[in-house]
Amino acid sequence: MIACFIGDSRMEGLYFYGDLKEADFLYKPGATVYDIMNIKLSMNGGGSCLLTDVLSGKQYSHIYMMVGVNELGDRTPDEYAKAYSNDIETIRQLQPDAVIFIIGMMHVTTQYSNSSDVFNNDNIDARNTAAASIANGRDIFYLDMNECVDDGVGGVIGDYSYDGVHLKAEYYKLWTEWMKAHGIKNLIK
């Protein structure tokens, strides 16, 4: 395995429905930048393990991480970026040769965004901007996957989501195809 994907329930969806068979996935619904290094995550749909244990025992060439939706109401974008940066630094220490991709947090639907003071696309954009600042253009990069599910006004297309936050199963392949079209087609299958 050359690629590892890390995240919350949205990454879990990518594991189950994104058709990325040759990558490892570590995820937990509800995971945040504040706890992802200290909680047990599911690995490839199986047993649970600590992220640091997996990253200590196996080297990856590329690591993709997306978290953020669960902590939208917790702390400021700058505090979020600091915690994310600390997580990335821990990953870097355990994976010195890996290229790390921070995947920008997926928006919610416009309808969902308009109905929430916390879980809305303005808050997501503020945190995505903060997370993007961690990228260094050498071995840490930022990817904004929102364009593959965008409704034209900054939200996920309503029909693509079953709850306003998560994609329906059939739309995770759009995310996979977007990633393959943006320079990583030889890394994931």
Spans of model-derived segments:
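Conserved SGNH/GDSL esterase-like catalytic core that processes O-acyl groups on lipids
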Residues: M1-A83
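Conserved beta-strand termini and adjacent loop/short-helix elements that scaffold enzyme active sites
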Residues: L26-P29, I103, L143-C148
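Catalytic His-Asp segment of secreted/periplasmic serine-dependent ester chemistry enzymes
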Residues: V108-K189
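Alpha/beta-hydrolase-fold catalytic nucleophile elbow
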Residues: M66, I103-G104
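Charged helix-capping and loop-helix junction motifs
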Residues: D78-D87, I124-R127
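A short helix->loop->beta-strand "cap" motif at the edges of active sites that frequently abuts
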Residues: Q95-V99
